[in-house]
Amino acid sequence: MDFLKSLPPLQTTDSNSTTAAVNTTTTTATNTATTTATNTATTTTTTTTTNLNNLINESKKKIHRLTQEVVNKISAGEVIQRPSNALKELLENCLDAKSTTITVTVKDGGMKFLQIQDNGSGIRLEDMGIVCERFTTSKLTKFEDLRSIQSFGFRGEALSSISHVSHLKILTKTADSPCAYRACYLNGKLTPPSPNEQSSDPKPCAGVNGTQITVEDLFFNTPSRKNVLKNTVDEHSRIVLLMKKYAINNPTVSFILKKQGDPTPEVHTSGGQNSLEKDVIGSLYGTDLSKELKIITIDPNNPNPNNDDDDNISGSQIKNSNLNRLDFTMKGFFSSTNYNSKKINFILFINGRLVDSKNLKTGLEQVYSKYLPKGTHPFMFIRLLVPPKNIDVNIHPTKSEVKILHEEQIIEFIQQKVDQELSISSNSKTFSTQILLPGFDQDNVSSSQKKQKNSQSSSTQTKSTNNNNNPTSRKEPIEYAKDKIRSDSKSQTLDAFLNPMDYNNNNDSSIDDNDGSGIGRYDDVDGSAGAAGAGGKFNDNLIFNDNSENEAPRDIDNPLSSVTPIKSKEQRQQQSTTTTTTTTTTTATTKSNSPASKNDIKKLQEHTFITPRKTRKYKQVELTSIKTLISEFQSNVHDGLKEFFNDCVFVGCLDHSYALVQFGKKLYLINLENITKELFYQLSLLRFSDFDSIKFSQSLSIYSLLLVSLDSPLSGWMESDGPKDKIADYLTKLLISKKELLNEYFSIEINEDGELVGIPQVLDHYVPCTDNLPIFLLKLATEVEWEFEKECFAGIVKEISSFFKIEPSFLKLRDTQVNNQQQTNSTTTTNNINFIKKDGKEWIIQHLIFPAFRKLSPPKKFANDGSVIQITTLDNLYKVFERC
């Protein structure tokens, strides 16, 4: 109770002073409340007065009619939303004009230049004055005509809308006109072709029958729309897809699409009366799809239609139809259960119009989900014919939506029919077969070969006997030892058939030395690369430090390793054990908690490595840009080097940059870095959009990896470039914006959080050195020309090849450090460690890289740039050693 003594004494007051204090407090509180209420009332009165004044001002505004220019621009923005919408309107005009050849030329995704030319009926000279005015058409005279409309256009808004958001030029000629006429349009009116000319009348000129419409500087007067459509690659892809859709629906019409200045078309169909939809699908999407197409025809009035009859249904067949309540017919091309793709291809034409139907698309996807693997999609092309009286086409400004009578029942009918056909096809599987030559008996091959060998042996013995008995007979030429070739490129050693994992475990190729001799390019402060991938920070003092004690990456030495977590310095120093190696008494130290141990490696491979396909048939590429890049290296092949790489025999690795090979009687030295870079460049193009994937056990933060790369002298970063964190943040956002393209075509998987999930598997069983992963991402973001398709793909493939090549720099540096340590450490121990690591790398080069050289198309520059150098010949060696 002593603490009570320290408390201050209570102050006592009389009752009068207490009452006075209470009264004073009450008066003060009352005054404060009164003041607050007054202020609140004043504020409320001010707000009410302001709102009342605003209402009075709003009521004074008069309703007025919008000017025609404003109305036209609003309408143009609804009808022409992007270049593909403009092209769709122009394509339909060409088809309405009965054209048989349609050529489209674009630049910058149609934003800068879009031109379409046909050989249709053309535009009369008398009509050129009003052809671009709003609500002018030759296909509709009264509203009731919509009930029987057979043409695509009917509103007369397409050319008018285009002329209000671009510079429009028309060159046209009718069959009965002696010459062609050209005119320029702006805001729906004729305009002089140049400021120097005053007349805007159409000018006569030379031309062929048909119409050529040129659209330049689309959305030049609507900068907000133009800024939204900056991705010209995406716009160009939409145009390509649109052309393919119309080409399939109109197989008798020739469609040609090409970029301005490029003579090679990206889309080209021959057309002709004998051309069928299936042929067009095969030419545009590949024969692998066309072989798996099922033609499904639905006619409620004919329960057993013949799928082979009348492959081209025209819109005129719906006239005078006498069907039941579901008055429609359908013909569709559906992929079977043997085909699937990463992206769905759903194409729907109703009465010849390209439209969207989410209900029908979703319903058919549900049907296919029962037969296709998860994450894959089918190909569906549907042509639906409905009487015009049962369809409302005037629903959407872009005509992309329509309303059909009894839509739900029609969709259900189609679902049942497709499900029935797919259930039948799911019971069969298509396999490729090889046709045997006539008279070829495969079962008797072995016996016939044995008989042939026995007969040859007998004849040889007989010949030998005759030669011995007859001294005058001619002798066989003698083969000297110096001329005998004892190697064969077709023969294989026993270790080639061993599992690569077992091979490395048996040889302990992933053993680390506890003296810190390994040279790594970065360490993880938290003890694992996964921590950095999850947003952890890298140690800036250990990144790209050649003198640090980081572990050397084991990806090159271990052909099946994926991204191995890098231990921190503290973890590596915690514990070590001594392991006795092979035939010598030399010992090498390793850490029991290191990922290089057998159990840890096995665990890592189970979680991070995806075994690729053993055999591969390259997917047929349809993109013109990729075909061009492939043809470039295939047309630049050195025939002599092609034969050299097909038949050369691996001798051994001279160091981490060069390998020795034998070809015939000659010994060559080849540059592994140059040749493997070209190899992975070609393989990446051949495997375009068909890569296997190497998955990381834990996603890696791209932002952190980019910061790591910027700390490297290889990045070329300077202070004038700006802060590293801002650069890394900008480049991360850039790569995230391109993640769909990178994943679709190259299996470089990036998630929404800006983390790297996986990289492509370019060569089966081969994993690149992940030490170079930060620089790879930096180069991918900065060295690729994203705006143009061909340059974009070429740049990405170039960076992939640089990432996957046999890169000797850090391995050479490691050997240099090991050699330096020989002066202070045991020479036998150091040499043994170096031998183990080199042996694992040599296995990869011999059994993974060298077999792939047979797929290489060596360029002609390899003959002169030092990639292949002749060292000596058997004749020269025999002059020195006189023996094999």
UniProtKB/Swiss-Prot annotation:
Keywords of the record: Cell cycle, DNA damage, DNA repair, Nucleus
Entries under Gene3D superfamilies matching the protein: 3.30.230.10, Histidine kinase-like ATPase, C-terminal domain (3.30.565.10)
Compartmental location: Nucleus
Organism: Dictyostelium discoideum (Social amoeba)
Ranges of biased composition (kind: Low complexity): 446-472, 577-590
InterPro entries, per database record: DNA_mismatch_repair_CS, DNA_mismatch_S5_2-like, HATPase_C_sf, Mlh1_C, MutL/Mlh/PMS, MutL/Mlh/Pms-like, Ribosomal_Su5_D2-typ_SF, Ribsml_uS5_D2-typ_fold_subgr
Name of the gene encoding the protein in the UniProt record: mlh1
Family membership: Belongs to the DNA mismatch repair MutL/HexB family.
Protein name in the entry: DNA mismatch repair protein Mlh1
GO biological process: mismatch repair
Function: Heterodimerizes with pms1 to form MutL alpha, a component of the post-replicative DNA mismatch repair system (MMR). DNA repair is initiated by MutS alpha (msh2-msh6) or MutS beta (msh2-msh3) binding to a dsDNA mismatch, then MutL alpha is recruited to the heteroduplex. Assembly of the MutL-MutS-heteroduplex ternary complex in presence of rfc and pcna is sufficient to activate endonuclease activity of pms1. It introduces single-strand breaks near the mismatch and thus generates new entry points for the exonuclease exo1 to degrade the strand containing the mismatch.
